[in-house]
């Protein structure tokens, strides 16, 4: 298998035999997972500041755009196509200042205190359907005075330069992303770090947000180690995203795209467009196509030349389990990240559980049945008996501990208790849960009118889904039964 050496200064790429890449492999398991809600809540009452401003034990994020409107709101062009607003200079982001108070504090603090962390930023609205919500989410890049990446440790998370301020809106519990990212982080070698915080934008309180580590690679403080400097060269992997194709983004025409195995499109997230030329883009396309061709070939499960030599199998197994348990309807279609690490293997990475656990826009999702067995890449993996058995055994193990009903319920209860004061302030800013719902979910009856109802819905779905999977997880063997996949498994070594 070939691998890349990326020379960013000269913007060229040459081929290196992959056997050398593991010598520089970064083990991202060394970072201990922090679950913010496990910190002790201060027992003494908060001393309100003289100006009556915000007092909280969550970090406070203050953003000042100097009155400039943040771009990225969806609008229609003359052809009735969906486009996004831009800044006055035509850019997709604007310059702003971000200050964080109580960056890693576990005590009460006030909005008028001195910031613990400060940085210039570039900011825009982000998301697909979520850009339509009253409460937007934001993409943030920390920059220095020269406009270069400025990785900083935020809220006790590893230093990074790209962050998402996710504003829960559709999820009335406000904890889906926080909970499932953290659970995935206990299962998998990498999952985005997350922290709850409260946001003040241009002096106005904007409510409860989740500061989220953006999935990116590179040398600039990225915990996802896709680039390692050697003596004379730079070894690099790459990161791809399967999603809607956004205007201005070039799709990667890989094997499953040009053979019409998926209507969704891949984009290269890393290396960024500024750090790759047409030659490097083509090499990534060919390299990933080779993986897909292997996976979709008749000898896909052979030990010598099959998929197992190309992927971190555990990563794909855990991705399957956590997305099936949560019925995360987007997984394998939208917001789906896959990366090739410096270990020369492909890994899956979780992202976006906003629609999970029957919180999907367009229809009510049953708690029965599997869905990832029909999604890209997994539709082939599930044909392999060894892969299916690993899912079954891993699932049973996780249900005895981390993903047991008792453990999940406790996680929900403790997290909701932790953010309760901030949720109350959030609702004072945005109106009652019933007002926020606005019939976004179909049918209308699914638009819950209280936080307690949302909690009950989340717990109820996980209980029913978990019970069904407990009783039916072993039926996954039907997808790898020899009578069903004989045409794929007839090739001998």
Give each language-model segment a name:
Residues 2-119, 406, 410-413, 417-493:
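Regulatory N- and C-terminal appendages and interdomain linkers associated
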Residues 138-141, 161-167, 174, 198, ...:
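Structural recognition of the beta-strand scaffold that forms the well-ordered cores
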Residues 26, 71, 269-332, 340-493:
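Middle-to-C-terminal accessory/interaction subdomains
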Residues 146-147, 189-190, 205-318:
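Internal "kinase-insert"/substrate-recognition segments embedded within catalytic cores
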Residues 113-138, 200-201, 222, 229-244, ...:
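Carboxylate/His-rich catalytic cores and anion/metal-binding grooves
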Residues 100, 107-167:
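Conserved oxyanion/phosphate-binding beta-strand-loop segments in alpha/beta enzyme cores
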Residues 143, 152-208, 279, 289-311:
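A conserved hydrophobic secondary-structure block that centers on an alpha-helix together
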Residues 73-75, 110-111, 151-153, 176-177, ...:
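Short, solvent-exposed loop/turn and secondary-structure capping segments
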């Amino acid at each position: 298998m070939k691998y890349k050496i990326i020379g960013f200064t000269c913007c060229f790429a040459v081929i290196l035999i992959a056997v050398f890449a593991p010598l520089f492999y970064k083990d991202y398991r060394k970072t201990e997972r922090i679950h913010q809600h496990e910190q002790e809540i201060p027992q003494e009452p908060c001393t309100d500041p003289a100006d009556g401003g915000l007092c909280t034990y969550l970090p406070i994020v203050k953003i000042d755009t100097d009155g400039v409107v943040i771009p990225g709101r969806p609008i229609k062009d003359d052809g009735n196509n969906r486009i996004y607003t831009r800044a006055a200079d035509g850019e997709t982001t604007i310059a702003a200042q971000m200050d964080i108070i109580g960056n890693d504090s576990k005590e009460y603090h006030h909005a008028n205190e001195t910031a613990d962390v400060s940085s210039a930023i570039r900011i825009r609205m982000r998301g697909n359907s979520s850009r339509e919500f009253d409460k937007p989410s934001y993409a943030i890049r920390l920059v220095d005075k020269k406009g270069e990446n400025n990785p900083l440790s935020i809220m006790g998370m590893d230093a990074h330069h790209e962050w998402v301020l996710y504003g829960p809106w559709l999820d009335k519990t406000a904890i889906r992303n926080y909970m499932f990212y953290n659970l995935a982080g206990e299962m998998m070698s990498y999952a985005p770090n997350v922290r709850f915080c409260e946001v003040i934008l241009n002096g106005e309180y904007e409510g409860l947000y989740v500061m989220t580590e953006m999935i990116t690679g590179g040398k600039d403080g990225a915990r996802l180690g896709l680039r390692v400097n050697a003596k004379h060269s730079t070894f690099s992997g790459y990161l791809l995203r399967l999603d809607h194709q956004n205007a201005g983004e070039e799709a990667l025409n890989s094997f499953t795209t040009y053979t019409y195995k998926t209507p969704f499109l891949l984009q290269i997230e890393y290396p960024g467009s500024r750090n790759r030329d047409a030659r490097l883009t083509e090499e990534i396309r060919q390299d990933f196509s080779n993986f897909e061709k292997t996976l979709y070939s008749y000898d896909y499960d052979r030990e010598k030349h099959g998929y197992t030599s190309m992927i971190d199998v555990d990563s794909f197994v855990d991705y399957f389990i956590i997305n099936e348990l949560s019925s995360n309807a987007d997984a394998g279609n939208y917001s789906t990240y896959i990366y090739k690490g410096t270990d020369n293997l492909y890994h899956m990475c979780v992202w976006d559980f906003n629609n999970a656990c029957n919180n999907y826009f367009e229809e009510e999702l049953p708690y029965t049945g599997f869905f990832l067995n029909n999604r890209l890449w997994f539709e082939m993996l599930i044909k392999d008996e060894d892969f299916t058995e690993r899912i079954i055994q891993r699932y049973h193990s996780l249900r005895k501990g981390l993903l047991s009903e008792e453990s999940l319920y406790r996680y929900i209860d403790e997290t909701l208790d932790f953010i309760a004061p901030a949720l109350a302030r959030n609702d004072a800013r945005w109106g009652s849960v019933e007002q926020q719902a606005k019939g976004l979910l179909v049918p209308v009856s699914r638009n819950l009118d209280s936080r307690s109802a949302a909690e009950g819905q989340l717990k109820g779905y996980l209980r029913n889904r978990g019970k069904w999977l407990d009783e039916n997880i072993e039926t996954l063997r039907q997808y790898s039964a020899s009578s069903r996949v004989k045409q794929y498994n007839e090739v001998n070594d």
